Amino acid sequence: MNASAVTIRRARPSDADAIAGLASQLGYSAEPSAAADRLSRVLARSDQEFLVADHEERPVGWIHMLVSEYVEAEAFVVIGGLVVDREYRNQGIGRRLL
């Protein structure tokens, strides 16, 4: 499998379980119901973006981005989180998400 076989799309509320599962690979213990609540809030905000990498309609990675600004600087993006499933790492998926 290569990164071109992956589709990048905006996260949907129905992705919450998969997102929580992938977050657990980073050491976070996200309850699916809590993840669903937080994801819904993130998706409703215009200053945040949450993208999912799908392979064969299965989420295999995600990135959470937030827009931030300082008085002394233009707006910039902060990466709140980025994960690719262990089985899919080192194939360019993280690069595609970025």
Which residues does each PLM region occupy?
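Hydrophobic/basic alpha-helical segments enriched in Actinobacteria
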Residues: 10-12, 50, 54, 59, ...
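Residue-level recognition of the GNAT/N-acetyltransferase active site
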Residues: 12, 85, 89
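Helix-loop element at the rim of GNAT/NAT acetyltransferase active sites that forms part
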Residues: 20-33
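Active-site rim helix/loop that mediates acceptor-substrate recognition in acyltransferases
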Residues: 30-50
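A conserved beta-turn-beta hairpin within the catalytic core of GNAT-like acetyltransferases
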Residues: 69-79, 89
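Conserved acetyl-CoA pyrophosphate-binding loop and the N-cap/start of the following alpha-helix
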Residues: 88, 92-97
